[in-house]
Design a protein with these regions (language model features):
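Patatin-like phospholipase
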Residues: 1-198
Length: 198
């Protein structure tokens, strides 16, 4: 696929699979995280819309409208972007969590004044509150995950390096980061399999 073009999704393979999944997004009106599963997806376009809703970073990307409701990135929700609540609701007690920040990372306070968010999201006070509370929620969930890891109930897969940010657009740098990640995954796969087998 050329830069600027959409990467086609293999809808046929998706439709043939019965593997369960969850897509989490933040409901801008209620301030709650909503999780969609296979049963909620009608077609390829609907799937794409839900994925966009799940990853629409506040301010950087527009809200996504779905069935008359505005959604943003699920990372601003109650668990700070970790879908542990969804996994628990589905009955899971052990968790493999793929991290995007280095070991020891904690989110610092929101830097921009609250008034900026209040102006941008004046119709959505729940979004303002969620953005302002994200560091607290993220850090609290990460503390919980680290405790679960100490108890043998979670495997936190940290990147050895993260040479790109979520706003990276340079294809060469993205590809290089991907290759680094694949090398680490191959090295760490035996330990991950051992955890999953336990």
């Amino acid at each position: 696929t050329a830069p600027g073009e959409l990467l086609p999704y293999n809808w046929e393979a998706y439709s043939a699979s019965s593997t369960p999944f969850k897509i989490g997004s933040f409901d801008c009106t209620t301030g709650k995280t909503v999780y969609w599963g296979r049963e909620d997806v009608k077609d390829n376009s609907d799937f794409t819309t839900r994925c966009q809703a799940s990853s629409s970073i506040p301010i950087a990307m527009p809200m996504v409208q779905l069935d008359g409701t505005a959604y943003l990135d699920g990372a601003i929700g109650e668990t700070g972007g970790f879908a542990v609540d969804a996994a628990r609701a589905d009955g899971y007690e052990r968790f493999l969590v793929v991290m995007t920040r280095p070991r020891g990372y904690r989110k610092g306070p929101v830097k921009a004044p609250a008034a900026i968010y209040q102006k941008i999201f004046k119709k959505y006070p729940a979004v303002v509150e969620a953005i302002l509370r994200r560091p607290e929620r993220y850090n609290a969930t990460l503390d919980e995950l680290e405790q679960l890891q100490a108890e043998g109930k979670a495997y936190l897969y940290y990147p050895e390096t993260m040479p790109v940010s979520n706003g990276e657009r340079n294809a060469v740098r993205i590809q290089a980061a991907y290759e680094e990640g694949m090398q680490q995954a191959r090295r760490d796969l035996p330990a991950i399999k051992e955890f999953l087998a336990g």
